[in-house]
């Protein structure tokens, strides 16, 4: 713990803003339930251009404010992962978490895009910069994994192969830009309930398992959306659709509108549609919006970088 005489020397004034992306799962294979209740996952994440902005300032006490879409649905206390990230980072360096956090949400809430995990990753990066801590990237990843299995990818960004609970990451070569339409269905799907439903379905008759991720990795390396489209797969999709049958209509609407393929992303209820071009994605998004099968539609592209500090505007 630092003493009051030295603290001022290593606490610069001002603020730091970090942009951080949401994610889609292009491939998700789920192992059987382990004794500890978790499932081994093999997944391919891609960070996409729906970004939250997280600003951290020095303050007298820890506080959290949230604006933007769905902000009223989120806690602004210790229940929020961003708050927990501030406490964890401060504990790691032996300080009090005396910062104010402002989150401007563009990643839809409860959309399965790991927006809460993204905000937690952004807080780690912002505090590291604001306090000039120089905590190495390796240690940031360790802290991120303590917060949750999706937090390390929000730091990593790009495209990655995740194993374990999804937190053990290997960078994946992804040439070219892929264009997505993201349709956020009505209703929430709690991840634990989707896993439980998948366990039930497997006991009853075992929905088909995906082949290994090799062909998906090859399509990403080739940068070929037509090659990637038929390979998109999610073993949780059957469980998500079982709990929310309306997802079938959403998936059908996207493909009928011209998407190359559609998939439930992660545990849902987001449906991700791969499109052949940016213009096609706009057309598909417009058509899906008009059909009334979901609450929100967004157009995005990927891969994009993980949590990064926004450069301060230069003085003229």
Curated annotation (Swiss-Prot):
InterPro entries assigned to the protein according to its UniProt record, in alphabetical order: GHMP_kinase_C_dom (IPR013750), GHMP_kinase_C_sf (IPR036554), GHMP_kinase_N_dom (IPR006204), IspE (IPR004424), Ribosomal_Su5_D2-typ_SF (IPR020568), Ribsml_uS5_D2-typ_fold_subgr (IPR014721)
Any Pfam family the entry gives: GHMP_kinases_C
Organism phylogeny: Bacteria, Bacillati, Actinomycetota, Actinomycetes, Mycobacteriales
Protein residues bound to ATP: 108-118
PANTHER family in alphabetical order: 4-DIPHOSPHOCYTIDYL-2-C-METHYL-D-ERYTHRITOL KINASE, CHLOROPLASTIC
Keywords, in A-Z order: ATP-binding, Isoprene biosynthesis, Kinase, Nucleotide-binding, Transferase
Enzyme active site: 23, 150
Metal-binding is among the record's keywords: no
Enzyme class: transferase
Listed GO biological process terms: isopentenyl diphosphate biosynthetic process, methylerythritol 4-phosphate pathway; terpenoid biosynthetic process
Similarity-based family: Belongs to the GHMP kinase family. IspE subfamily.
Highest taxon listed in the record's lineage: Bacteria
Catalyzed chemical reaction(s): 4-CDP-2-C-methyl-D-erythritol + ATP = 4-CDP-2-C-methyl-D-erythritol 2-phosphate + ADP + H(+)
This protein's record includes keyword Nucleotide-binding: yes
Task performed by this protein: Catalyzes the phosphorylation of the position 2 hydroxy group of 4-diphosphocytidyl-2C-methyl-D-erythritol.
Catalytic activity, EC: 2.7.1.148
A molecular function GO annotation: ATP binding
Protein name (database record): 4-diphosphocytidyl-2-C-methyl-D-erythritol kinase
Functional pathway: Isoprenoid biosynthesis; isopentenyl diphosphate biosynthesis via DXP pathway; isopentenyl diphosphate from 1-deoxy-D-xylulose 5-phosphate: step 3/6
């Amino acid at each position: 713990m630092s003493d009051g005489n030295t603290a001022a020397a290593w606490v610069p004034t001002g603020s730091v803003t970090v942009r951080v992306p949401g994610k889609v799962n292009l491939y998700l294979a789920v192992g059987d339930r382990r004794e500890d209740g978790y499932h081994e996952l093999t997944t391919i994440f891609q960070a996409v251009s729906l970004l939250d902005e997280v600003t951290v300032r020095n303050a007298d006490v820890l506080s959290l404010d949230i604006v933007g879409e769905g902000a009223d649905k989120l806690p602004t206390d210790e229940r929020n992962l961003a708050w927990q990230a501030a406490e964890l980072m401060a504990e790691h360096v032996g300080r009090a978490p005396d910062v104010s956090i402002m989150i401007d949400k563009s990643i839809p809430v409860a959309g399965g895009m790991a927006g809460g995990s993204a905000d937690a990753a952004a807080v780690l990066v912002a505090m590291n910069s604001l306090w000039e801590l120089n905590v190495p990237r390796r240690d940031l990843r360790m802290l991120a994994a303590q917060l949750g299995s999706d937090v390390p990818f929000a730091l990593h960004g790009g495209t990655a192969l995740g194993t374990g609970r999804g937190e053990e990451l290997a960078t994946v070569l992804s040439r070219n830009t892929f264009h997505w339409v993201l349709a956020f269905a009505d209703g929430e799907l709690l991840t634990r309930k989707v896993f439980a439903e998948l366990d039930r379905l497997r006991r009853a008759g075992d929905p088909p398992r995906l082949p290994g991720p090799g062909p998906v990795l090859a399509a990403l390396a080739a940068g070929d959306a037509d090659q990637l489209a038929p390979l998109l797969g999610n073993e949780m999709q059957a469980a998500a659709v079982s709990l929310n049958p309306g997802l079938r209509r959403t998936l059908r609407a996207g493909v009928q509108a011209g998407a190359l393929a559609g998939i439930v992303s992660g545990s849902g209820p987001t449906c991700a549609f791969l499109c052949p071009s940016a213009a096609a994605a706009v057309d598909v998004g417009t058509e899906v919006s008009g059909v009334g099968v979901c609450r929100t539609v967004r157009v995005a592209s990927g891969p994009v970088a993980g949590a990064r500090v926004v450069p301060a505007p230069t003085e003229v």
